[in-house]
Amino acid sequence: MSRHHRPFTWGGAQPGASFSNPTSPTLEASTFGFEPSVPDIYRRAWILVTKDASAELFADTSDADIHLGLLHKLLTSAGGLGPGSAEQIVNSACKGSRCSRSDFYCALGLLHQMQQGEELDVHLVQQRLTMGSLSAPVLDLSDATLNPHSHHTFPPTAPSGPSRIDPRPSTFMREMSDPWNANSSGSYNGIDTRPAYNQYDAMPQQYDTLNSHDSALPAGFAGNVSSGSFERIKFNAGDDRRSHQLLAHNQGSSTDTFLAPDRTEARARQPNTRQERPFSYMSDTAETNAVDAAEDPAADLPEDQVTVRLRSELEGFIIKHNVYIVSSSLRKSQVTRRYSDWLWLAECLVKRYPFRCLPVLPPKRIAMPIAGRHLSADDLFIERRRRGLERFLRMLTCHPMLREDKLVEVFFTEPRPIAEWKSSAPALFLDEEGLIKTVDEAERMSIPEDLQLKLTQQRQAIPELLERWTAMVALFERIVKRNDAAAADYSRLNFSLLSVIETSARRWRPGSDNGKKTEEIMSTMASIFQDHSDTTSSRVSAVSLSTLEGMKAQRDLILSFRDLIGRIDRQLVDPIDMLKKRIEASQKRITTLAASANSNSASIQQEQATLSAQVKQDTQSIQKYLNRRIHAKKTVWEELIWFHHRFKAVEEDMQKFVRDETFFLSTLTRMWEATEMKMKMIR
């Protein structure tokens, strides 16, 4: 199987991300070809500006995006340009709020043009980049010249020691806006989604996403906040305690929205090894059952951190396809999977567990290689799909029943490709769980008498809840994009002000004006603009990796219950009435044959035996389907409880968002106050 490198504009996998980083190059910058040949200085410069991120954030430095300030700093220090010339190159090469690798190479090509005294022509540089004929600019890449990254996070990282919540490795991948924008006429998990929503993230027209900002969200907490933005501010002890309290929000994963609301107590109760836990709610009456419903069925489950990363290489000889790296902390496994493997798993689960809340799969668009391009394989769509696949697996691992399924275990632990495993594995039996499991008396007693009333109430609320939640997610995402665009604009404002200072130094001034107060004030202003940009950029990453992704996970939860209701309506039908009528007809026929004059003949006795066997078989079938009805009721009741506790988990996410937003705004306030005091001291 041949492998080709992903297009050099691709923002691919980073190791171990709880939630991927919301960054991606703009579509205008994407080329979807193979990586062209560039001089070695281009790659060395790119590795330099991403070296701090490569070990922690990205599986491949080619997959990173960088802040515009890093490119500007490289051009002014290593490239020897003035602020005005560097600003001109940045604005020409980078049209969005981030700098992709293709933008970076284009900027270095423009730098070479400027060093040669040529007129800047971005189209010519892009053409040469595609053809692999770029020339090498003069760059001084010594470590003393460029220090591209700081080591600050937002909020600041707490010192080592016990924390309220165990921190997770902080790694990030790109995030895009998560309306899929895919008009799908198919069905997810067995339910046709066309009547209610024609798009995955359908929303009322008044909430249509604004297109005024061509923004791509920034690359993680670390590496965005400049050292100066926090070196200028001294935090008191109260601020330190405050930042320590907020540590859990950024180091944790917002996909914990599927965990218990009180995660601290849940983790304290977690055993080191898995324990069997009966998934039933025993009670004598519906009133007592309401007390049992207060217990979260997933509270004692050991936590499993699942990550899905996209490999930087495409596989396939003729038609290329993406390959994902799936990691599980609980199983200590790391395997490679294709989208078709998710599809296979979803189809198996919907056959085996039709009356459980199954996660939804993101849509798939067929990629056809045409003139070196892969249709529907743009960065935005692939990243949305990767995030959806990760949410799919996280929801599985948070479900008490689904996480223990053998096929789920195979998906997470089988080192071979699923297609190869299926060719050598025994035949799969995908019988519905209600047909092979017997409901005992205790489980029957766990079903509330008013289950139908509860389900009707849920059925009526779900459609409107899904519509409103989807609209809220889209609105919140618009806010995140605007903040990201504002961060980029503050950075560009810093570039412009530095250019003004450079030009202002050449203006005429009277001989008596020997002071440089004006330039110092403008320089201080430019510095606060960049600090504001860095801090806001980190905050955008924090919100995107936590609150926004948590909201999308909750939306998927609601959508999965809507699909469950659809399966209940379609599949909770059985042939019991037909079997009863056939039994009655067979019994009448047996009675008639017994009363006939030739009842002792061999043919009549043979017919009686056949009818008796048919009656026995139909009676067993009726018993099986009756057990299926009871099992379906028990399962639906369990899913109602599980959905309730998963939905309540949003409380903590919103509380953390408010706490972190307060810290962010207070940080900005202190930064501007410090700048005001510094300006007053300028003489």
Swiss-Prot record:
Disulphide connectivity of cysteines: none
Binding site for a 1,2-diacyl-sn-glycero-3-phospho-(1D-myo-inositol-3-phosphate): R338, S340, K364, R385
GO terms (BP aspect): protein targeting to vacuole; retrograde transport, endosome to Golgi
Biased composition (Polar residues): 248-257
InterPro entries: PX_dom, PX_dom_sf, SNX8/Mvp1, SNX8/Mvp1_PX, Snx8_BAR_dom
Presence of keyword Transport: yes
Domain spans labelled PX: 302-418
Keywords, in A-Z order: Cytoplasm, Membrane, Protein transport, Transport
Record's keyword annotation contains Membrane: yes
Coiled coil: none
Gene Ontology CC annotation, any one: cytosol
CDD domains: BAR_SNX8, PX_SNX8_Mvp1p_like
Topological type in the membrane: Peripheral membrane protein
Region called Disordered, residue ranges: 1-25, 246-276
Location(s), subcellular: Cytoplasm; Membrane
Superkingdom of the source species: Eukaryota
Function: Required for vacuolar protein sorting.
Family: Belongs to the sorting nexin family.
Domain note: The PX domain binds phosphatidylinositol 3-phosphate which is necessary for peripheral membrane localization.
Protein name from the UniProt record: Sorting nexin MVP1
Organism per entry: Mycosarcoma maydis
